[in-house]
UniProtKB/Swiss-Prot annotation:
This is tRNA modification GTPase MnmE. (6S)-5-formyl-5,6,7,8-tetrahydrofolate binds at residues 23, 80, 120, 454. The keyword Disulfide bond does not apply. Mg(2+) binds at residues 230, 251. K(+) binds at residues 226, 245, 247, 250. It is an enzyme of class 3 (hydrolase). NCBIfam families: mnmE_trmE_thdF, PRK05291.1-3, small_GTP. It comes from Escherichia coli O139:H28 (strain E24377A / ETEC). It is found in: Cytoplasm. Homodimer. Heterotetramer of two MnmE and two MnmG subunits.
Length: 454
């Protein structure tokens, strides 16, 4: 970023509206005010003024707000012009401002980027601005606001501070090996390390929940042919998204539906029936089904209730359960309750949710919808929750791996130097979340996804 650049952009959505806002940030914002308004407004007071063209004619009239730096959103001098929301009027005013030397159109996210570079926001807070704008549910909006107000950053900074204290302790043990107390073997470092690992695990769990709120949960419907998978997809989607017949193997490819349940985003995926393939096309479809299962956030294990009375998934199809990724959540869905006469509703079997329904009639499907909402955290108390992005999850995961490797070095060989290095790497991973340690490349990718005027 050049210190000589003063940027301008429309801060309101394109198109017609009651109000249109142009935002200017940089050292020439003062010159813009004096040129277009004829005066410098009183700081942080709304001033109703005409917006003038170069020949003195009035282009529009509206509210001008002046925020001298560093007490502004970006940390620079900021001017906001709030006029009428017609695109022609805003375009004329924008062209007028751009005639002033040293002014240019802002890049996407450049206002937030400058706020980050001037220490007005950390990187997680800056990302939360875009997440708040893009939020698709009330819970996602509340969580994004929590992140913007620093909830996520505070948790990360607490971990970084704990790692800093632990590193100091470890470095002391390395630098002063002749002390009477062996810091590496007296158990104190191990206890502190375990505390940090436990805190990090808690943050990771909340971050995974926040990622589901932001990006949506990937739910794969899997099971044997003719279990009713496509009928369930149609019931959840509220339309005929998949062809349904009595012929086994009708679905041969992956079908995707993006739906919202009370504003919560879900990616529902219908897959080919799992069995020994009878032809090449079906075999490819089954391979793709397993690929989707391996990447799922949750699997709906669809069971034809007319073929078995079993409810434990390990009893219904042990080979299928054995092949699933470890820790992948499973919901057992016993279908065709309209035929079997089973009592509709939800229960639990060996730690797995069990839902009895009829995909054909729609009976019991609402119970499944509520279950999916709850599994995303919709019904839980998340007043202090925050949104998280995939890069946040990756950074937390890498930090956790370094801490586990450091613990192994400590317990296996009392190798203080190796432990100190793993702690340093974990601290670096966490600092990438808030932007204390990051690359220009990463900043460019993050802020380029923002709105122009943000």
């Amino acid at each position: 970023m050049s210190d000589n650049d003063t940027i301008v952009a429309q801060a309101t959505p394109p198109g017609r509206g009651g109000v249109g806002i142009l935002r200017i940030s940089g050292f020439k914002a003062r010159e813009v005010a004096e040129t277009v308004l004829g005066k410098l407004p009183k700081p942080r007071y709304a001033d109703y003024l005409p917006f003038k063209d170069a020949d003195g004619s009035v282009l529009d009239q509206g509210i001008a707000l002046w925020f001298p730096g560093p007490n502004s959103f970006t940390g620079e001098d900021v001017l906001e012009l709030q006029g009428h929301g017609g695109p022609v009027i805003l375009d004329l005013l924008l062209k007028r401002i751009l005639t002033i030397p040293g002014l240019r159109i802002a890049r996407p996210g450049e206002f937030s980027e400058r706020a980050f570079l001037y220490d007005k926001l950390d990187l997680a807070q800056a990302e939360a601005i875009a997440d708040l704008i893009d939020a698709s549910s009330e819970q996602a909006a509340r969580s994004a606001l929590n992140s913007l107000q620093g909830a996520f950053s505070a948790r990360v900074n607490h971990l970084v501070e704990a790692l800093t204290h632990l590193r100091i302790y470890v470095e002391a043990a390395i630098d002063f090996p002749d002390e009477e107390i062996d810091f590496l073997s007296d158990g104190k470092i191990e206890a502190q390390l375990n505390d940090v690992i436990a805190d990090l695990d808690a943050v990771r769990a909340e971050a995974r929940q926040g990622s589901l709120l932001r990006e949506g949960m990937k739910v794969v419907i899997a099971g044997r042919p003719n279990a009713g998978k496509s009928s369930l997809l149609n019931a959840l989607a509220g339309r005929e998204a998949a062809i349904v017949t009595d012929i086994a193997g009708t679905t041969r490819d992956v079908l995707r539906e993006h739906i919202h349940i009370d504003g919560m985003p879900l990616h529902i995926i219908d897959t080919a029936g799992l069995r020994e393939a009878s032809d090449e096309v079906e075999r490819i479809g089954i391979e793709r089904a397993w690929q989707e299962i391996e990447q799922a956030d949750r699997v709906l294990f669809m069971v034809d209730g007319t073929t078995t009375d079993a409810v434990d998934p390990a009893e219904i199809w042990p080979e299928f359960i054995a092949r699933l990724p470890a820790k992948l959540p499973i919901t057992v869905v016993r279908n065709k309750a309209d035929i079997t006469g089973e009592t509709l509703g939800m229960s639990e079997v060996n730690g797995h949710a069990l839902i009895r329904l009829s995909a054909r009639t729609g009976e019991g499907v609402e119970v499944l919808r509520n279950h999916l909402k709850q599994s995303m955290g919709f019904d839980t108390n998340m007043e202090g929750g925050f949104l998280a992005r995939r890069r946040h999850l990756q950074a937390l995961e890498q930090a956790a791996e370094h801490l586990q490797q450091g613990k192994a070095q400590l317990l296996g060989a009392w190798a203080g130097e190796l432990l100190a290095e793993e702690l340093r790497l974990a601290q670096q991973n966490l600092s990438e979340i808030t932007g204390e340690f990051t690359s220009d490349d990463l900043l460019g990718r993050i802020f380029s996804s923002f709105c122009i005027g943000k």
